[in-house]
């Protein structure tokens, strides 16, 4: 769903696609949204509120530490290609942090392919962790735990709690 920072364009794009039978949507510019917590919250919650119940949303290029809060907000899936994307940037994705290996040389002589495999493995773990917390009705706990990993993550949670409490009560289990 394109539209940049213009939420009304994203909503119109989604509604027109729903009219012609689409129900799966990839939110464009995911990596840019992660750096702007207010816009991230506005885009995701607006799309979820205005979509049909049968629609699902996929977030592109999500950092692993953001996956719990994105799921909590209503994102239904993530692109596995983000592991490849971040490996080309020489970034190791872990459940709590994204490490630029040029700055943090955690692994010596790791190839891009090996880095992609590690990123996929960590993504699979993060998804399993999210599923386990969902089954145990403790996703909010995981969200709060991960919110401390980056300033953008904690800002996203604070903005979500402050501006979208009605949305959270309607669409999520708080604990």
Give the residues covered by each predicted segment.
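C-terminal extensions of enzymes
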Residues: 106-175
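Glycine-rich phosphate/ribose-binding loops and adjacent secondary-structure elements
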Residues: 1-114
